[in-house]
Design a protein with these regions (language model features):
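A short glycine-rich, hydrophobically flanked beta-strand micro-motif that places a catalytic Asp/Glu
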Residues: 128-139
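C-terminal active-site "lid" helix and adjoining low-complexity regulatory extension at the edge
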Residues: 110, 137-176
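Residue-level signal for tight coil/turn positions that link beta-strands
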Residues: 26, 80-81, 139
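Anionic group-transfer/hydrolysis microenvironments
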Residues: 34, 67-68, 77, 134-136, ...
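Phosphate-binding site of ATP-dependent enzymes
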Residues: 41-126
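Protein kinase-like catalytic core scaffold
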Residues: 29, 82-85, 131, 143-145
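Active-site nucleotide/adenylate-binding loops and adjacent lid/helix of ATP-dependent enzymes
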Residues: 1-71, 113, 117, 173
Length: 176
């Protein structure tokens, strides 16, 4: 997929295809509701057939992703062809999601350049000009988990960045 490093991901449609999920993914794996899974809602860690059945009862389309066991990820916001903010999101204990809305915490420590470059290259390759990209480091590599066109602004607030002013300045400078 555009040479973007990402966890193995597959979409399954219909009853016949859904029956093939466990042929392609062994638990644990991540299952997402394809639309509307914002702020960590609609994202499930599937550990057994019962949890898979519960998930499948919620959606006609199964969006399945390889589970990478990490305790934190990086949110990189790209606007107008440049990285404007990046921060760590740390998952609460016994939770695989690091979303702030799911109890995750925000850390403003420096983000590795390799992660910033992956996010920027992903945004440019996909022609996204206002996106929050979630990245993790696993087994020595960086992976893009997902991209969010409607990303939270709490990271800006905690960093003391006025998001509205940032957008206004970028518009005035014709950066976007």
């Amino acid at each position: 997929m555009l040479n973007i490093s990402h966890p193995r991901t597959r979409v399954f449609y219909g009853k016949r295809q859904k029956k093939m999920i466990t042929e392609h993914f062994k638990p644990p794996f991540v299952a997402k509701i394809p639309r509307g899974s914002a702020m960590g809602r609609g994202v499930y860690l599937i550990r057994n057939q019962g949890e898979l059945n519960d998930y499948l009862s919620l959606t006609d389309v199964a969006y399945i992703q390889e589970y990478l066991p990490v305790d934190r990820d990086i949110r990189v916001v790209v606007i107008g062809r440049r990285v404007v903010h990046a921060y760590w999101r740390i998952a609460p204990q016994n939770e695989f999601r690091s979303n702030l809305a799911q109890g995750g915490s925000l850390c403003l420590d420096a983000v590795p350049q390799e992660a910033l470059e992956l996010a920027l290259n992903t945004a440019l390759s996909c022609r996204w000009d206002d996106v929050g990209i979630d990245i993790c480091r696993h087994a020595g590599r960086y992976y893009v988990f997902e991209a969010n066109m409607k990303y939270g602004k709490e990271g800006f607030r905690q960093a003391g960045i006025n998001y509205s002013q940032l957008m206004e300045t970028m518009i005035q400078n014709e950066d976007i």
